[in-house]
A protein has these predicted regions:
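Conserved functional hotspot residues or short segments at active or partner-binding sites
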Residues: 1-83
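C-terminal regions of mature proteins
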Residues: 69-110
Length: 110
């Protein structure tokens, strides 16, 4: 049935990570979006305001970070973004640590 939707516009995707395996959802999704943007000639990021009461586009609201937006649009490289994510994750982990219920370490970009 993989030809069932041939020729139709894709409006989303689902990921099914392997249970028990460490998985970095942000990194994976950024790479998927970048791959699609680089390899699908008809792919565009919609222009204009995404929702009423906010002056940002959909991609700006979803990613919320200029460097991540630059990456998915092709004007930044993965190594730069990966280092940026590491720094931002460390800040978040320090803030979140006091609220954690378990000793398990949070998974980080490596």
């Amino acid at each position: 049935t993989f030809h069932k939707y041939k020729g139709e516009v894709c409006t989303g995707f689902q990921l099914h990570p392997v249970p028990g395996e460490q998985y970095h959802a942000l990194a994976h999704n950024l790479k998927i979006i970048r791959f699609v943007a680089d390899n699908c000639p008809g792919f565009i990021f919609p222009d204009g305001v995404y929702e009423r009461g906010n002056d940002k586009s959909a991609i700006e609201l979803l990613l919320g970070d200029k460097l991540l937006i630059d990456y998915v649009k092709g004007s930044s490289d993965w190594e730069t973004v990966k280092e940026h994510i590491k720094v931002e994750e460390q800040k978040w982990i320090r803030k979140a640590k006091k609220f954690m219920l378990y000793e398990e370490q949070l998974y980080r970009c490596k």
